[in-house]
């Protein structure tokens, strides 16, 4: 089905990308359509990219402060670093949950109810 393929392609493309948080949010809402191992693998790719970005932000901020750049000019860099830390913490917890085979996933999690499917369809409109 073309619609399903479109969704899966989007999930595969957007989860590892850290520069597009809104698109990643949409992809995360559909990650349940992937096999567990594939979902965990994509999330680990994202984790690596986020960790690298966090290191870059923290290192850049530290260097700027060491050179005497006033903190007031680095507020956004600080904010971005804190947001990256928060996302990394959440993502690592999510990966641990999904990697645990006791965590229901796919068919083992049960089928969505008709009410859920209707609400999901209404939200798309």
Indicate where each model-derived feature is located.
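Amphipathic alpha-helical coiled-coil segments and their boundaries
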Residues: 36, 43, 70-73, 77, ...
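Acidic interhelical loop/turn segments
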Residues: 58-79
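Long amphipathic alpha-helical coiled-coil segments
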Residues: 97-113
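Amphipathic heptad-repeat alpha-helical coiled-coil/stalk segments that mediate oligomerization
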Residues: 109, 113-125
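Amphipathic alpha-helical dimerization/coiled-coil segments
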Residues: 8-62
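Basic, amphipathic "hinge/linker" alpha-helix immediately C-terminal to the N-terminal HTH DNA-binding motif
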Residues: 1-8
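Hydrophobic stripe of amphipathic alpha-helices that form coiled-coil interfaces
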Residues: 57-60, 64, 91, 98, ...
């Amino acid at each position: 089905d073309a619609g399903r393929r479109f969704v899966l392609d989007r999930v595969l493309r957007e989860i590892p990308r850290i520069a597009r948080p809104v698109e990643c949010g949409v992809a995360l809402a559909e990650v349940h359509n992937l096999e567990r191992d594939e979902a965990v693998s994509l999330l680990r790719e994202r984790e690596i990219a986020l960790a690298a970005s966090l290191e870059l932000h923290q290192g850049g901020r530290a260097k700027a402060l060491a050179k005497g750049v006033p903190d007031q000019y680095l507020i956004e860099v600080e904010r971005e670093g804190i947001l990256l830390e928060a996302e990394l913490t959440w993502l690592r917890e999510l990966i641990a949950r999904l990697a645990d085979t006791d965590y229901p996933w796919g068919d083992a999690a049960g089928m969505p109810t008709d009410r859920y499917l209707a609400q999901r369809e209404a939200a798309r409109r």
